[in-house]
Swiss-Prot record:
PANTHER family from the UniProt entry: GLUTAMYL-TRNA GLN AMIDOTRANSFERASE SUBUNIT B MITOCHONDRIAL AND PROKARYOTIC PET112-RELATED, GLUTAMYL-TRNA(GLN) AMIDOTRANSFERASE SUBUNIT B, MITOCHONDRIAL
Entry keyword annotation includes Ligase: yes
Record-linked HAMAP family: GatB
Similarity annotation: Belongs to the GatB/GatE family. GatB subfamily.
Nucleus listed as a keyword: no
Short name of one Pfam family: GatB_Yqey
Entry-linked InterPro entries: Asn/Gln-tRNA_amidoTrfase_suB/E (IPR017959), Asn/Gln-tRNA_Trfase_suB/E_cat (IPR006075), Asn/Gln_amidotransferase (IPR018027), Asn/Gln_tRNA_amidoTrase-B-like (IPR003789), GatB (IPR004413), GatB_C_1 (IPR042114), GatB_Yqey_C_2 (IPR023168), Gln-tRNA_amidoTrfase_suB_CS (IPR017958)
Protein name in UniProt: Aspartyl/glutamyl-tRNA(Asn/Gln) amidotransferase subunit B
GO molecular function: asparaginyl-tRNA synthase (glutamine-hydrolyzing) activity; ATP binding; glutaminyl-tRNA synthase (glutamine-hydrolyzing) activity
Catalytic activity: L-glutamyl-tRNA(Gln) + L-glutamine + ATP + H2O = L-glutaminyl-tRNA(Gln) + L-glutamate + ADP + phosphate + H(+); L-aspartyl-tRNA(Asn) + L-glutamine + ATP + H2O = L-asparaginyl-tRNA(Asn) + L-glutamate + ADP + phosphate + 2 H(+)
NCBIfam families per UniProt: gatB, PRK05477.1-1, PRK05477.1-2, PRK05477.1-4
């Protein structure tokens, strides 16, 4: 029996604001517990929330970038539940009138393009964080309480884990390029919940939904969905019923584990937030935000391919992160050849990042240094071999490439008036190589080049040496 999967994703993005959504407390990652809180975050009696307008600006940027319709009037609602990290016993969110609806993202999987709908996106506050100590005590950190979140809820349009992975990749890229969030999953500024059901092929009615919450990497999303597909198929084929439930992904086993069975959707008794007035969004403000939107990844890709002439694959690699793309643009602006800059960034720079498990913001190589080095390669000042030594020094120590080359005497020898006599002497001293060359043995010229390189301690420009040798040998 064949089955069809239906997948929907809920993605939370931490919006990049200086203060929280309803209080003036600062927002930063890694601060000491409960040092970025105040009476509003603690839900002290009599305090009232004060809306941070910048949250709307950032949310609207994401809405516009995903072709979503921004609602002219939105309001906040109370989602009622009790948990230690939620001191008010309710969360302020948007349930009845969200920020935006009816958007979409285009993905490409296995060579086919597909449009994935965005059901809605809404603004809400984050909860605090519980930590359970080995001493039997539990601790609550309210630093995260009230941090602004944008939740993007997809339509259930994805039909396999690869489509879900492609959707997440594209959504993350779009949000990152708007600057609304730094989308760092390892810091919790991007979190993913998945919903998956399966049904026999040809059946219209959807199967029973299984939810998986707080998946902390794209790989976990893909692997957990793949496992859950197979698990649900086995349940149905054995005559059982899939339970409406929440499960978690066990990274060690690659399996999903039951957390709780649901009897139905939770009743959070939503009602309008009485302490925050409905928020009216003027079209003129939406237009102003749209005008200020930074260049999208799709626009950059077009520029890289059409204006800079680099390959589509190279453009896609550069655009995997905004930091990488910004670094590339800065290098080209500093005078680097676009194609050479793409090659060095995608091979040498990315190789260093992967090997050392760091981001491009952590390295000491600047875009200007990369541009300077590429210019020296292109004008023949240094060889590609020497360039790798210069690159290593610059990326590890931040050394200026030009100064390093001059201080170490690495300037490539390209002066024909110096190399010409050396070539003539090497040819005179190696008559057998001349004979071999005339007999069509290509290795002969390689030997002669090697002799020149040995005499110049590797500083001779190989291209110039080859040209001079060919000319000299042809004249014999």
């Amino acid at each position: 029996m064949n089955f069809k999967s239906t997948i929907g994703l809920e993605v939370h993005f931490e919006l990049k604001t200086k203060s929280k959504i309803f209080s003036p407390s600062p927002v930063s990652y890694g601060a000491e517990a409960n040092t970025e809180t105040n009476v509003i975050d603690w839900a002290m009696p009599g305090v009232l929330p004060r809306l941070n307008k910048d949250v709307y600006r950032l949310g609207i940027m994401v809405a516009l970038a995903t072709h979503s319709h921004v609602l002219p009037v939105t309001h906040f609602d109370r989602k009622n539940y009790f948990y230690p990290d939620n001191p008010k016993a309710y969360q302020i969110t948007q349930f009845f009138q969200p920020l935006a609806r009816d958007g979409y993202i285009e993905i490409e999987v296995r060579g086919k393009k597909k449009r994935i709908g965005i059901h809605e996106m809404h603004i809400e506050e984050d909860a605090g964080k519980n930590t359970h100590g080995a001493n039997g005590y539990s601790y609550v950190d309210l630093n995260r309480q009230g941090v602004p979140l944008l939740e993007v809820v997809s339509e259930p349009d994805m039909e396999d884990p690869e489509e879900a992975y492609a959707y997440l990749t594209k959504l993350r890229q779009i949000v990152q390029f708007t600057g609304a969030s730094d989308v760092k999953m390892e810091e919790g500024s991007m979190r993913v919940d998945t919903n998956i059901s399966i049904r026999p092929a040809g059946q219209e009615k959807l199967g029973t939904k299984v939810e998986m919450k707080n998946l902390n990497s794209f790989d976990h999303v893909r692997r957990s969905l793949a496992y859950e597909e197979k698990r649900q198929q086995q349940v149905l084929l054995s005559g059982g019923r899939v339970q409406l439930s929440t499960r978690r992904f066990d990274e060690a086993t690659g399996k999903t584990v039951l957390e709780r069975v649901k009897e139905g959707d939770a009743d959070y008794r939503y009602f309008p937030e009485p302490d925050i007035a409905p928020y009216h969004i003027k079209q003129s403000w939406i237009d102003e935000i749209e005008e200020s939107l930074p260049e999208s990844p799709f626009e950059r890709r077009k520029r890289y391919v059409e204006e800079y002439g680099i390959k589509e694959y190279d453009a896609d690699v550069i655009l995997q992160t905004k930091e990488s793309s910004d670094f590339y643009d800065a290098a080209v602006a500093a005078g680097a050849d676009p194609t050479l800059a793409a090659n060095w960034l995608n091979t040498q720079v990315n190789g260093y990042l992967n090997e050392n498990q760091v981001g491009i913001a952590d390295i000491k190589l600047t875009p200007e240094h990369l541009a300077e080095m590429i210019k020296m390669i292109k004008d023949g000042t240094i060889s590609s071999k020497i360039a790798k030594k210069v690159f290593k020094e610059s990326i590890e120590n931040g050394t200026d490439p030009k100064k390093y080359v001059e201080d170490k005497g690495m300037v490539q020898l390209s002066d024909v008036s110096v190399l010409g006599p050396m070539v003539t002497k090497v040819v005179d001293d190696n008559p057998q190589s001349v004979e071999d060359f005339k007999n069509g043995k290509d290795r002969a010229i390689g030997f002669l080049v090697g002799q020149i390189m040995k005499q110049t301690r590797g500083k001779a420009n190989p291209k110039v040496v080859n040209q001079l040798l060919n000319k000299e040998l042809q004249s014999r």
